[in-house]
Amino acid sequence: MQKLSKFTGLIVGPFLLVISVGALAHGDVTPHPVDTSSLDPIGAEWVVPNPYRGNEKAVAVGAVGYLHNCAGCHGLNAVSGGVAPDLMKLDNECLDLASKVKQAACMKEADVYFKDITLNGKKNGEGRSTMPGYGGVFTQEAVWAIKAYVDSRTLEERGK
């Protein structure tokens, strides 16, 4: 019986070690580049508002970029699980405005906010990073494609 227990320990111990290391690796926040080669290039100069809003090809590219870089914290299909802010709420106030001029100005502000946080990350009041910055990895096309995806999900959830 004693030998069986040692044998079991020799088998189960390394297995548990591998599983625990895998669990720790699950929280990987390494930015993954987004393939935007199918999109029209925007250029080096940052453009606001999002030039890809409503562009179906950009939405598809953004969906893949979102899945690989954002879903772990912000939720699958942009449906927040409560870990990080609900990105679909970014544009809700804008979409509720009656004036199209005010709505456009509000959406432009939301785009700037999204771009700045995406590129530079976010820290809490204690200086701890609560979101990594993707400025070293994401192109302008990637940022706007992901925002186009989030915008499309917002409209879809609102039934528009």
Annotate each language-model stretch with its function:
Residues A25-H32, Y52, G81-L90, I117-T154, ...:
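Axial heme c-ligation environment in periplasmic c-type cytochrome domains
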Residues Q2-V12:
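Bacterial N-terminal signal peptides that target proteins for export
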Residues P31-G65:
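Electrostatic cytochrome c docking/interface patches
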Residues A58, Y66-G72, N77, D91, ...:
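Short pre-active-site segment immediately N-terminal to redox-active cysteine/selenocysteine motifs
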Residues V12-V18:
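Classic N-terminal secretory signal peptides
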Residues S20-G22:
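N-terminal signal peptide c-region/cleavage motif recognized by signal peptidases
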Residues C73, A105-K108, I146:
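Primarily secretory-pathway and cell-envelope proteins
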Residues V59-A63, V79-L119, V137-F138:
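Gly/Gly-Pro-rich "capping" loops immediately C-terminal to redox-active cysteine motifs
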